[in-house]
Amino acid sequence: MDNKNVVVCDNGTGYVKCGFAGENFPTSVFPCVVGRPLLRYEESLMEQQVKDIVVGETCSELRHQLDINYPVHNGIVQNWDDMEHVWDHAFYNELKINPSDCKILLTDPPLNPSKNREKMIETMFEKYNFAGVFIQIQAVLTLYAQGLLTGLVIDSGDGVTHVVPVVDGYSFPHLTKRMNVAGRHITAYLVDLLSRRGYAMNKTADFETVREIKEKLCYISYDYKRESQLGLETTILVKNYTLPDGRVIKVGTERFQAPEALFTPELIDVEGDGMADMVFRCIQEMDIDNRMMLYQHIVLSGGSTMYPGLPSRLEKEIQDRYLDTVLKGNKDGLKKLRLRIEDPPRRKHMVYLGGAVLAGIMKDAPEFWINREDYMEEGINCLNKMSQA
């Protein structure tokens, strides 16, 4: 089967990454948003020939005139009608495929309710009529992209952060940790911090602008207290940012305060462990034979792991916890730990890359895919085949 007949689609909370098997980069990356014209704009929109529903990039351009919906929340599809509009856009406008000639590999967040998986399979066969479908857990695909079968994946995208242990290609749902702090929450926190400085940023349109500020200027501090002190005593951290309307704003300590929520979720009133605690607890709860292997292969994935300073801060925090809890302060034991955090430069699209690798290898293996006949015969029960794959 030709690579162009095997589609890979990674639906995230913020973006959909889609393309074909064996590719090194997604053919298309577009925001996972659906917009409908606000009534008062319908007349003026007629000149622009906007259809009743807009998906993806166009939403950003016309965001003042649309009611915008995000079909995926915290990694899980909440609105299936809108999700179908997103898939229509991906398959027919971006990839320009005829689904009945293609197979598709979809990605699934860890701890996704099985009802969602069932609905996904049903939509792919009933609505789009794909020839074959496979759904794989995102963390496992991240490791494939890194050439590993065993490791600990920290996947932080737009809607949710997961820490997932994987051994020999199998993930462990009962040890998987989840935190509802990721890109979108950090942007919202940055909006809040900037408003305390006197810059009002509250409209959806401004939210996009603040996201750009975050991506350009934010970083993770190595030592939060010292950095805060530095911010109080000097202006060394202050950077200027030019807004789309030409105004210039100053961004200082907010640059590291916003992403700090990944390590200290209480900052934005989210209960639970931060990223370093989740990693440490997750590995320590694993059986003892696999722990060292996981400490040596911690792989970062997703756009919210792209902050400068994140790998070194994570390494420091995990070492501190290991020293206190496991070694009881004996520093000699740290040599054996050999902690290693892998931060591949293309980690923003890691899940997609792993999917493209897997789909490329398996494109001609009939036992790998759930085909249309399986689905017609067994219905949703055909998912059992996948859990054994």
UniProtKB/Swiss-Prot annotation:
Disulfide pattern: none
Family: Belongs to the actin family. ARP2 subfamily.
GO process terms (BP): actin cytoskeleton organization; actin filament organization; actin filament-based process; cell morphogenesis; multidimensional cell growth; trichome morphogenesis
The organism's place on the tree of life at top rank: Eukaryota
Chain's role: Functions as ATP-binding component of the Arp2/3 complex which is involved in regulation of actin polymerization and together with an activating nucleation-promoting factor (NPF) mediates the formation of branched actin networks. Seems to contact the pointed end of the daughter actin filament. Arp2/3 complex plays a critical role in the control of cell morphogenesis via the modulation of cell polarity development. Involved in the control of cell morphogenesis in leaf epidermal pavement cells, root hairs, hypocotyls epidermal cells and trichomes, especially during rapid cell expansion.
SUPFAM superfamilies for this protein: Actin-like ATPase domain (SSF53067)
Gene Ontology CC annotation, any one: cytoplasm
Pfam family, one: Actin
Subcellular location: Cytoplasm, Cytoskeleton
Tissue and organ distribution: Expressed at low levels in roots, seedlings, stems, leaves, flowers, pollen, siliques and at a higher level in inflorescences. Specifically localized in cells adjacent to mature xylem and in developing xylem vessels.
Other observations noted: 'Wurm' means 'worm' in German. Plants impaired in WURM display worm-shaped trichomes.
Phenotype upon gene inactivation: Distorted trichomes and altered epidermal cell types.
Induction of the gene: Repressed by light.
GO molecular function per UniProt: actin binding; ATP binding
Residue numbers binding ATP: G157, D158, G159, R211, E212, I213, K214, E215, G302, G303, S304, T305, M306, Y307
Oligomer status and interactors: Component of the Arp2/3 complex composed of ARP2, ARP3, ARPC1/p41-ARC, ARPC2/p34-ARC, ARPC3/p21-ARC, ARPC4/p20-ARC and ARPC5/p16-ARC. Interacts directly with ARP3/DIS1 and ABI1.
Name of the molecule in the record: Actin-related protein 2
Keyword annotations from UniProtKB, A to Z: Actin-binding, ATP-binding, Cytoplasm, Cytoskeleton, Developmental protein, Nucleotide-binding
Keyword Cell wall biogenesis/degradation part of the UniProt annotation: no
Entry keyword ATP-binding: yes
